[in-house]
Amino acid sequence: MKSKIITLSVLLLFSANTFAQDTKLTDYVDPRIGSEGLGRVFIGPSCPYGMVKPSPDCTPRPNSGWLPMPEQVDGFSQVHVSGTGGGPKYGNILVMPFGDGMDRTKHIDHRKYETIKLGYYTTQFQASGIQTEITTAPKASFYRFTYPKDSLKSL
Protein backbone atom coordinates (compact mmCIF):
# COMPACT_ATOMS: atom_id res chain seq x y z
CA MET A 1 0.00 0.00 0.00
CA LYS A 2 2.82 2.37 0.91
CA SER A 3 4.59 1.74 -2.40
CA LYS A 4 1.37 2.50 -4.32
CA ILE A 5 1.04 5.87 -2.56
CA ILE A 6 4.67 6.73 -3.33
CA THR A 7 4.28 5.67 -6.97
CA LEU A 8 1.08 7.69 -7.31
CA SER A 9 2.73 10.73 -5.69
CA VAL A 10 5.71 10.55 -8.06
CA LEU A 11 3.42 10.24 -11.09
CA LEU A 12 1.38 13.24 -9.96
CA LEU A 13 4.56 15.24 -9.37
CA PHE A 14 5.89 14.57 -12.87
CA SER A 15 2.53 15.13 -14.54
CA ALA A 16 2.12 18.51 -12.81
CA ASN A 17 5.09 19.78 -14.79
CA THR A 18 3.38 18.98 -18.09
CA PHE A 19 0.35 21.07 -17.12
CA ALA A 20 2.42 24.10 -16.10
CA GLN A 21 2.45 26.88 -18.68
CA ASP A 22 5.71 28.38 -19.81
CA THR A 23 5.37 32.00 -18.75
CA LYS A 24 8.14 34.44 -19.56
CA LEU A 25 8.21 37.20 -17.00
CA THR A 26 9.87 39.47 -19.57
CA ASP A 27 6.57 39.55 -21.48
CA TYR A 28 5.17 41.64 -18.63
CA VAL A 29 7.88 44.34 -18.88
CA ASP A 30 6.92 47.58 -20.62
CA PRO A 31 10.09 49.59 -21.45
CA ARG A 32 8.00 52.74 -21.97
CA ILE A 33 7.19 53.10 -18.26
CA GLY A 34 8.79 56.34 -17.07
CA SER A 35 9.76 57.49 -20.57
CA GLU A 36 7.42 60.48 -20.73
CA GLY A 37 7.16 63.51 -18.48
CA LEU A 38 10.13 64.25 -16.26
CA GLY A 39 11.24 60.62 -15.91
CA ARG A 40 12.93 60.41 -19.31
CA VAL A 41 13.70 56.71 -19.06
CA PHE A 42 15.19 55.51 -22.33
CA ILE A 43 13.16 52.86 -24.21
CA GLY A 44 15.76 51.17 -26.41
CA PRO A 45 17.26 47.70 -25.98
CA SER A 46 20.20 47.26 -23.62
CA CYS A 47 22.04 44.59 -21.68
CA PRO A 48 22.41 44.82 -17.91
CA TYR A 49 25.57 46.88 -17.28
CA GLY A 50 25.98 47.17 -21.06
CA MET A 51 28.10 49.88 -22.67
CA VAL A 52 25.60 50.91 -25.35
CA LYS A 53 21.99 52.01 -25.13
CA PRO A 54 20.74 52.59 -28.71
CA SER A 55 17.43 54.32 -29.19
CA PRO A 56 15.67 56.68 -31.58
CA ASP A 57 16.24 60.40 -31.17
CA CYS A 58 13.10 62.41 -31.79
CA THR A 59 12.36 66.08 -32.42
CA PRO A 60 12.17 67.92 -30.01
CA ARG A 61 15.11 66.34 -28.22
CA PRO A 62 14.29 64.90 -24.80
CA ASN A 63 17.06 63.52 -22.62
CA SER A 64 16.07 59.91 -23.23
CA GLY A 65 15.86 60.50 -27.00
CA TRP A 66 12.44 58.95 -27.52
CA LEU A 67 9.03 60.57 -27.78
CA PRO A 68 5.76 58.78 -28.57
CA MET A 69 4.34 58.86 -32.08
CA PRO A 70 3.64 61.03 -34.09
CA GLU A 71 6.91 62.85 -33.27
CA GLN A 72 9.49 62.50 -36.03
CA VAL A 73 12.80 60.64 -35.72
CA ASP A 74 16.10 62.43 -36.43
CA GLY A 75 18.11 59.21 -36.23
CA PHE A 76 19.36 56.57 -33.84
CA SER A 77 22.19 57.23 -31.39
CA GLN A 78 24.18 54.72 -29.41
CA VAL A 79 24.39 56.17 -25.89
CA HIS A 80 21.54 57.49 -23.77
CA VAL A 81 21.19 58.26 -20.10
CA SER A 82 18.11 56.96 -18.39
CA GLY A 83 15.93 58.65 -15.82
CA THR A 84 18.05 61.75 -15.19
CA GLY A 85 15.41 64.32 -16.08
CA GLY A 86 18.08 66.69 -17.47
CA GLY A 87 18.82 67.98 -20.94
CA PRO A 88 20.37 65.99 -23.81
CA LYS A 89 24.13 65.64 -23.73
CA TYR A 90 27.10 63.41 -24.64
CA GLY A 91 27.31 64.31 -28.37
CA ASN A 92 26.01 61.02 -29.73
CA ILE A 93 26.68 60.04 -33.32
CA LEU A 94 23.40 59.68 -35.17
CA VAL A 95 22.70 56.79 -37.55
CA MET A 96 19.78 57.22 -39.95
CA PRO A 97 18.80 55.05 -42.92
CA PHE A 98 17.43 56.85 -45.95
CA GLY A 99 16.53 55.94 -49.49
CA ASP A 100 16.03 59.23 -51.31
CA GLY A 101 19.56 60.26 -52.24
CA MET A 102 22.14 62.55 -50.68
CA ASP A 103 20.65 65.88 -51.77
CA ARG A 104 19.33 66.82 -48.31
CA THR A 105 21.19 67.49 -45.08
CA LYS A 106 18.45 66.04 -42.87
CA HIS A 107 16.51 62.83 -43.39
CA ILE A 108 13.92 63.19 -40.65
CA ASP A 109 10.95 60.83 -40.97
CA HIS A 110 7.78 59.91 -39.09
CA ARG A 111 7.15 56.39 -37.79
CA LYS A 112 4.42 54.29 -39.39
CA TYR A 113 4.44 51.83 -36.47
CA GLU A 114 6.70 51.04 -33.57
CA THR A 115 7.32 47.94 -31.43
CA ILE A 116 9.12 48.27 -28.12
CA LYS A 117 9.99 45.10 -26.20
CA LEU A 118 12.60 44.18 -23.66
CA GLY A 119 15.86 43.89 -25.64
CA TYR A 120 14.31 44.75 -29.03
CA TYR A 121 13.08 47.84 -30.86
CA THR A 122 11.65 48.12 -34.37
CA THR A 123 9.96 50.80 -36.43
CA GLN A 124 9.05 51.49 -40.03
CA PHE A 125 9.21 54.99 -41.48
CA GLN A 126 6.24 56.47 -43.33
CA ALA A 127 7.90 58.34 -46.19
CA SER A 128 10.80 56.00 -46.97
CA GLY A 129 9.24 52.65 -45.99
CA ILE A 130 12.52 51.61 -44.36
CA GLN A 131 12.23 49.24 -41.41
CA THR A 132 14.78 49.54 -38.61
CA GLU A 133 15.40 46.85 -35.99
CA ILE A 134 17.74 47.25 -33.00
CA THR A 135 19.10 44.88 -30.37
CA THR A 136 22.26 44.85 -28.25
CA ALA A 137 25.11 42.80 -26.86
CA PRO A 138 27.11 43.87 -23.78
CA LYS A 139 29.48 46.08 -25.82
CA ALA A 140 27.77 46.65 -29.18
CA SER A 141 24.46 47.55 -30.73
CA PHE A 142 23.13 45.69 -33.76
CA TYR A 143 20.96 47.26 -36.43
CA ARG A 144 19.09 45.70 -39.32
CA PHE A 145 17.78 48.06 -41.98
CA THR A 146 15.29 46.66 -44.49
CA TYR A 147 14.86 48.92 -47.51
CA PRO A 148 12.06 48.78 -50.08
CA LYS A 149 13.15 47.01 -53.29
CA ASP A 150 13.21 50.09 -55.52
CA SER A 151 14.84 52.59 -53.13
CA LEU A 152 18.41 53.75 -52.79
CA LYS A 153 20.16 52.23 -49.81
CA SER A 154 22.00 54.86 -47.80
CA LEU A 155 23.00 55.30 -44.18
Residue ranges of each PLM-predicted region?
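Enriched but not universal
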Residues: 2, 20-21
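Bacterial N-terminal signal peptides that target proteins for export
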Residues: 1-7
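N-terminal signal peptide c-region/cleavage motif recognized by signal peptidases
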Residues: 15-16
